[in-house]
Amino acid sequence: MDEILIKLEQILEQRKSAKADKSYVSSLYNKGTDEILKKISEESAEVIMATKDGSNDKIIYEIADLWFHTLVLLRFKKIKVEQITNELSRRFGLSGLKEKANRNN
């Protein structure tokens, strides 16, 4: 799984130097955080609607869009996929209640 995320991360990084009129991702980078967050919000809503109304195929499609736009945000903020997978690994085996309690400390 990490392999496709790493490949996407590399492509998204390359898009930073592309012309905005030639690259959707570059146009998002040029518009900045608010536009990227707007797309993530839209995609989140589409996941919710697909879950309520759609088939599993539609849910998968919409979650792929959400993950993609989340990866765009990560690259925009210079956060690597590895940092996210490291955080998930850190949480693995930790109960959700304990992890939540640790956030307050």
Curated annotation (Swiss-Prot):
Any single biological process term in GO: L-histidine biosynthetic process
CDD domains found in the cross-reference section: NTP-PPase_HisIE_like (cd11534)
Broadest EC class assigned to this enzyme: hydrolase
Biochemical pathway: Amino-acid biosynthesis; L-histidine biosynthesis; L-histidine from 5-phospho-alpha-D-ribose 1-diphosphate: step 2/9
One cellular component term from this protein's GO annotations in UniProt: cytoplasm
Catalytic activities: 1-(5-phospho-beta-D-ribosyl)-ATP + H2O = 1-(5-phospho-beta-D-ribosyl)-5'-AMP + diphosphate + H(+)
Keyword Hydrolase: yes
A molecular-function term among this protein's GO annotations: ATP binding
Enzyme Commission number(s): 3.6.1.31
Compartmental location: Cytoplasm
SUPFAM superfamilies registered for this protein in UniProt: all-alpha NTP pyrophosphatases
Keywords per UniProt: Amino-acid biosynthesis, ATP-binding, Cytoplasm, Histidine biosynthesis, Hydrolase, Nucleotide-binding
Family: Belongs to the PRA-PH family.
NCBIfam families: histidine_hisI, PRK00400.1-3
Name of the protein in question: Phosphoribosyl-ATP pyrophosphatase
Native source species: Vesicomyosocius okutanii subsp. Calyptogena okutanii (strain HA)
The gene coding this protein: hisE
